[in-house]
UniProtKB/Swiss-Prot annotation:
GO terms for biological process: translation. This is Small ribosomal subunit protein uS8. Belongs to the universal ribosomal protein uS8 family. It comes from the Bacteria. The lineage of its organism: Bacteria, Pseudomonadati, Pseudomonadota, Alphaproteobacteria, Hyphomicrobiales.
Amino acid sequence: MAVNDPLGDMLTRIRNAQMRRKGKVQTPGSRLRAHVLDVLQEEGYIRGYSTTEYGNGRSEFEIELKYFDGLPVIREIQRVSKPGRRVYTAVNAIPRVANGLGISIISTPKGVMADHAAREANVGGEVLCKVF
């Protein structure tokens, strides 16, 4: 089945797996998904991920989810910019998530990064998702 929003699909798989207290979840691979997973790993929301390459140019990620005292580290993960409604922001209007306790993941001309890194680099871009 074709997926119209691959990033939204990955975020939903993570959300559903954490509700079921799964240790790992698989999702099809792409460069954008890899960059978002890199940010989630750097910020401490997931343990890590591994890539499995298939011969026909396809790949799959296995994401290791993170828990603290039996509860998911990711309390909320939500897609902001969607295929039907893109959301862009300037550097001075980058939204704060949960009063600075969460992060926004932003696709900028300098790459995919967390909101605080985008402010430091003085770049805006497309707000992909927010994590708390």
